[in-house]
Amino acid sequence: MIDPDGYRPNVGIVLMCRDGQVFWGRRVRLDGWQFPQGGMHSDETPVEAMYRELNEETGLLPEHVQLLGATPGWLRYRLPSQAVRCNRSQMCIGQKQVWFLLQLIGDESHVQLDQSENPEFDHWRWVSFWYPIEHVVMFKRGVYARALCQLASLAQQVVGLEVGTMPQYVQDICLLNVGYKHLPNWVSRY
């Protein structure tokens, strides 16, 4: 399912533990790490897709998490040119995502990475709330910054100061109030 602009509808999941750290998964057979995410089926709402992807990629069920909130609209990112895909009638140039913030309320032993036929992750760990922005694959850094910026106030309400102070360059991305010359090199590409 690709929209008329070439973006595939998708959901992203920021899974937070009680101390404000977030789930960070290593992709199977790749050196890359990322948040759980995945495409929506044509008959799914974003919330339904989120719970399906959560289970497929982490083994967690709705009763293991609390849904804290979501980004208010779609956040987009473009794929690098070598990853752009075409089928008979449409070209997929990127993804548009609704990002969800969840808190793990069950025991972390419920995380099982082998729940689907083709697991997404082979290892996971907890990292600080802002860590993923500079450690995800380059072309996703802008969307990660925007998603975490939009979800940070919800996270702060739940865990207090444990999520840490938003780095200045993330504030600048989110508020768009400074020129790119003040930001890390990777930001100017997005």
Swiss-Prot record:
Accelerates the degradation of transcripts by removing pyrophosphate from the 5'-end of triphosphorylated RNA, leading to a more labile monophosphorylated state that can stimulate subsequent ribonuclease cleavage. Its cofactor is a divalent metal cation. Its EC number is 3.6.1.-. This is RNA pyrophosphohydrolase. It comes from Xylella fastidiosa (strain 9a5c). GO terms for molecular function: pyrophosphatase activity. A motif (Nudix box) lies at residues 38-59. Belongs to the Nudix hydrolase family. RppH subfamily. Residues 6-149 form the Nudix hydrolase domain. It is an enzyme of class 3 (hydrolase). InterPro entries: NUDIX_hydrolase-like_dom_sf, NUDIX_hydrolase_CS, NUDIX_hydrolase_dom, RppH. Keywords: Hydrolase. Pfam families: NUDIX.
